[in-house]
């Protein structure tokens, strides 16, 4: 384990950089002065939106550095947005559930340095924005997630007070935050603990990773996919338990079994082609995006030795091997194979962006049976 005394944060023109996921090195450091855009995806939720806007008016964050973008997913009537904070409404055509596209539309209209995503049915406590934006204000690649609690806000008509009935928080998520020390000990599976309903990052980092994937057109999954892509791009993940917002109604675990099962099955199907985590790919089928992208240089090989090297990589499962070099095509052509995992040429950045691991191989290497398991840690 790294000794904390031997690591430190350091300043760059873009902000503070920390080694690994060590956001704890900035404990006690005040936020930088940034402007914040709260992006609220919305569809026919006027009463809930009104509660959200009223709660945003009560934030202890400076109003002159705060704006709200309501991203309407094609509601029949436009939302009413009476608020003491500047509010912009952007609208897209109603083509079904497109929360990912709505969030991107809202982000595109935002002018703030930091994007704070907040669902229209999730009402923040007064310190929410201040707490959630602190790390992104300091670390340019921070991705923070707040604490989403649950209550029947429609019945209460306000945020809960002591003695009010509450709904359960998802135990699996609370356990994950406890085990990981609020994601300080994040790993390749921590994307599952980032929720777009209470999520925050720098505008520049959001643009760098490409925003939400708009192929998601049903409930759930787009936040996990974005968090996975951000992690692969070097994001610093942090759960901020003091950034509390209240969801109006139960978590999915508290909803009818059939609805929950159908939604989770659809989410899993949408994630598997894009997230290469083996736990997200349990059905034995192969996807276009591999977990490992390997580049093997043909220089110094014969056709036979090249095949031995490539074959030793392919035995490791979810792998695509690119063979490059002047003789790559002729060598591979002699093998007589019909294997879509083997390609001739060099991968583009887009080809490798979603893979967890990239391997470059020169010379006549032969990989043992456990080599890639060791690589994956």
Go through the PLM ranges and name each one.
Residues 92-110, 343-350:
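Glycine-rich, basic loop-to-helix element that forms the pyrophosphate-binding segment
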Residues 127-169, 365-377:
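Conserved donor NDP-sugar-binding/catalytic core segment of glycosyltransferases
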Residues 55-93, 314-343:
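Acidic donor-binding segment of Leloir-type glycosyltransferases
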Residues 1-55, 270-304:
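N-proximal low-complexity "stem/linker" segments adjacent to membrane-targeting elements
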Residues 115, 358:
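Short aromatic/hydrophobic "clamp" motif used to bind/position activated sugar donors
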Residues 219-225:
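Acidic donor-binding loop at a coil-to-helix junction in glycosyltransferase catalytic cores
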Residues 163-191:
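Short, flexible, basic/aromatic active-site loop/helix in glycosyltransferases
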Residues 111-112, 195-209, 354-355:
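Conserved nucleotide-sugar donor-binding
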